[in-house]
Every structure is written in structure tokens, then in C-alpha cells.
Amino acid sequence: MSQSGDKPLKMVTCGSCGTKVFIPGDLAPLSTVACSKCGQSIMMPMRLRQFDLRGVIGKGGMGNVYRAFDTVLERWVAVKLMRKELVDDPRLLESFYREARACASLNHTNIIHIYTFDEFEGQLYLVMELADQGSLDSKIEKYHRLPELEVLDVGIKIASALDMVLKHSLLHRDIKPANILFNADNEPKLVDFGLARKVEAEHEVEDVAWGTPYYVAPEKIKREPESFLSDMYSLGGTLYHALTGHVPFDAPTVEEVVVAHVQTALTPPNLVVPEITQPTSDALVRVMAKNPAERFLSYDELIMALHAARAQLLVQQYALPETRQAKAKTAWWRL
């Protein structure tokens, strides 16, 4: 620790620009100040057992997620802290426990891996695999829409993850771009199982809980029983948004968006963006059918359709340069 006058200072590394800067040493743990170099927020680190929390990588209603260093295993992890004022709410507390149990029971490359769940001095925390390269939501915000091949790859991987979820008799119930994160290898990771529940409970109609109305299945809106087909619909809406740059249904009010999911015909993706291939467009139209019975009958069937669309897209992409080259040769011989 260094001192300037009577004020203690602490040297930390800015997570945004990598510069080592001094911040007030008496700053409360997890509090932030602006980096003197780049202006981005720098957080006062906090020690939680063997985990050094270094910076915020996500914020939610239940609490924040921090990038942390495990000083025992010497690896970077993510630590989710539940807001202390929520611990007394049995419903929210159960949601936090539900997320931990659900993720811990699943072992899939594209589902965030849980390392431990514990309590320290009244603070509940969840330690998990680090995926700090942004969400699908942030990618859409940055690029407006993503390349078709990338969207198909994400769709195939998350559909496979959801198939694993279903094989463990679980429904995720909150599929949206913000709940698909990316790690350093650009591998998509499904997160946030706070609303997950057992498939056996699918016939129990309960109050609808949405974080956002843009990807919710019609049967959920109508208070009809949910099934894995509801998760499938939400995945379709998520891919639609990433592919076209537009949510499937948009309107001035939440109520109108909700009604559109039930009553308004979906505009096929290739009518929104003409260069989207027909097989990809057809797959998303089917996965977002109003009637669950008209969607794909299984995740395997959906994955096969996305693989077929991907293969045809690659054929077209490879054929296009050859066509141009052939035209160029023809033009040369006509000279």
C-alpha cells in the first residue's frame, strides 16, 4: 500500500485498459471509482474465502456476478453474490438455491459449470465457470445482427444443452439472449437457472414470470401447461433476434407484444433480411409455431434441421466464389 499525504492508496489493475492505477485505500470492498487512464469503473477487490473478487461482469435482480481469482487452485472463476437484503425472502432464496442445484446436476460443454455453493459471514455465493466475453444480447447490441453461420452454430449448441436439461427432467424457462454467455474460446454457455423446475410440474399452471416478453411462448401467456417446447420456442425467438437484428414481435407496449405472440403471424426471417437462406428461415418459423404440436418434436429434430441449414449455407458460400470465378473466366475469353 502507498500513501499520498494522509490518504492511503491501493494499486489495482484496471480490467478495461490493463493499466495499474492507484485508488483510495479506504474505499469499501466492491465499491468503484473511475480509472484515471480510461475512465472505466475500477472496483476495490474483496476477499471471499479463497476468492479474490476483482470486477463486476454481470448485474441482475438477485445480485451481481464478479470476475474472481481462486487463490487455491490458481484459476479465474465467476462468483455470483446474492444481495443480502433478499436472503429473508423465501421465494428469492429458493430461486438462488434452485439455480445452484440445477446447474450442478448438469454436465455439458454449453451449460455453465458450477464449482461450489456456500455461505460466508451471512453472504450466499455461487462459484462457477468464467464466461466473461459478453452475452448474445451484448453482441446483438454491438453488431445489430450476427452472421447466419454464427447464429446456426449457437442454435445447435444451445439446443444440445437444452436437450441435456430435458434429459435431467428440467425446464429452463428463461431462454433469452442475455442468458447465453461466451467464454474466452467464444463458446456459448447457457446460464441462469433461477426459474428452472422439474418437468413433472409442467401440468401445474402458475403465475407467469417473465424477465422480458420478447421470447415467451404463447402457451405460457395463455396460462397453459409448459413443456420443453416452450423452451424451444424461446430459443427460436432468441435466434430470430440474433439473425435479423429484430425481436420476433415488437410493439409500443408490453401488453401488445404479449398479444402478438398469441395472435400475430411471425414474419419469416428471410422476409426481414433477404440474404437469410430458406432452410434457416423455415427452421425458425417452425420452431416458433403458435401451436406447440407444430414445432419440432424433439431437440434432436431441431438440431438436425439446423445442421441441414448450416450445410446448405456452406455450400452456397463456397459455390459463390466459384461462380464469380467462372464468370470472370468467361468474360476473359470473350475479350
Indicate residue ranges for each PLM-predicted region:
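Activation-segment/catalytic-loop signature of the eukaryotic protein kinase fold
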Residues: 117
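Conserved short submotifs of the Hanks-type protein kinase catalytic core
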Residues: 121-135, 139
